[in-house]
Curated annotation (Swiss-Prot):
InterPro entries: P-loop_NTPase, Rab, Small_GTP-bd, Small_GTPase. SMART domains: RAB, RAS, RHO. GTP binds at residues 32-39, 80-84, 140-143. It comes from Dictyostelium discoideum (Social amoeba). Its main location: membrane. This is Ras-related protein RabT2. Transmembrane segments: none annotated. A lipid is attached at residue 215 (S-geranylgeranyl cysteine). Pfam families: Ras. One of its GO terms (biological process) is vesicle-mediated transport. One of its GO terms (molecular function) is GTPase activity. Belongs to the small GTPase superfamily. Rab family. The gene is rabT2.
Length: 218
């Protein structure tokens, strides 16, 4: 059974830009145990909607405009890597080029909290820039107040022990605290100067050059 809910959104005005203008791309990877609600959190943040009973399969991502910071235009690419056991072996490629990570656990599931260390180890072992990675941790499903197993104080102490500066309990279902951890993560990444410059003009030129070479061979 599927239930769909929506909440009020706040619209941010994005400056008019040409499609060929350069921009800075920030790549964020969402990690956590299966059924912690990564897809639901991403859906709530990006589309402002919630659909009960929908699980992400494999890897999915969204790209959204962020805006201008210090004269540079930023776009955010957020990857939802499904971490069911059968997918863990294929996620290494998605760590490459990641500027930040959002780790999720289920507030009602102690094991998902215990496994946060596994996901931190994955970042250390698979991300080339792990020594300077930006990480936030969120506990999803805080709306299930009678079923919560992890005390927020315990979560905060864990974050402090790992030098992770941001922790937040959220609810994708009830749209509680969804935007704040994303904004904190993006701002910390930008402050560190971590992003990839994308030049659509250069990409287009390379594509055309490659096509011309192929035509000359024929």
């Amino acid at each position: 059974m599927k239930e769909k809910t929506t909440a009020t959104t706040t619209t941010t005005t994005i400056p008019t830009r040409n499609a060929d203008d350069d921009y800075e791309l920030i790549k964020v990877l969402m990690l956590g145990d299966y059924k912690t609600g990564k897809g639901s959190v991403l859906r709530r943040y990006h589309y402002n909607e919630f659909e009960l009973g929908v699980s992400s399969i494999g890897v999915d991502f969204v790209i959204r405009d962020y805006g201008i910071v210090n004269g540079k235009y930023y776009k955010i690419q957020i990857w939802d890597a499904n971490s069911c056991e059968r997918f863990r072996s294929i996620t290494q490629a998605y760590y490459r080029g990641a500027h930040g990570f959002m780790l999720l656990y289920d507030c009602t599931n102690q094991e998902s909290f215990n496994n946060l260390q596994f996901w931190i180890n994955e970042i250390i072992n698979k991300s080339p820039n792990s020594n300077n990675s930006t990480i936030v941790i969120i506990g999803n499903k805080c709306d299930l107040v009678n079923d919560i197993k992890i005390d927020p104080i315990k979560s905060k102490l864990f974050c402090d022990s790992k030098s992770i500066t941001s922790f937040q309990n959220v609810s994708a279902k009830d749209s509680i605290n969804i935007n704040e951890p994303f904004e904190i993560l993006f701002k910390q990444i930008i402050e560190k100067g971590h992003s990839q410059t994308i030049s659509p003009k250069l990409i287009k030129q390379r594509y055309e050059n490659n096509n011309n070479k192929s035509c000359n061979i024929l």
